[in-house]
């Protein structure tokens, strides 16, 4: 294991010492606003994937909604809430949720978000019936692979998951895995598995 990283019992890899990272509008513009048509395709892919796995739902909360592309699509099928720290206004028809950790919703989504949050202990207290997550898929072939991996971004990406560790992490927090795949790779094309997407159901609600 590389210096300043350690592996948890679940198999999740965590950066040990972290320098706070600033997330603002420029970060979103540089990271996501350059995707062009892929932004809209991704939003509808995500909606379709959720509907295909859990069926219809009434309420959805998107944590870290970025530039709002996903919520602009989701609001067409459900009552939507969102939370973001970067300064982007929430899309029309959606409600900003300052108290997002206390929200009772059918679906809570974390697209490209979980790996950035320094403290994930809040996960065990979520009240959503379903949680949907997309994170970089950390295959960890070797220390050298991990050192050169494009998604190893110290201080920005703090947590690293693969299929097994994400499943165990969510089980520890009261959710069972319904579906786990690399569906977003049809848009985020890469030479190997790139983005891991999981849909999880709360054991008790």
Residue locations for each model-derived region?
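Conserved active-site loop/cleft motifs that coordinate metal ions or position small ligands
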Residues: 132-134, 178-181
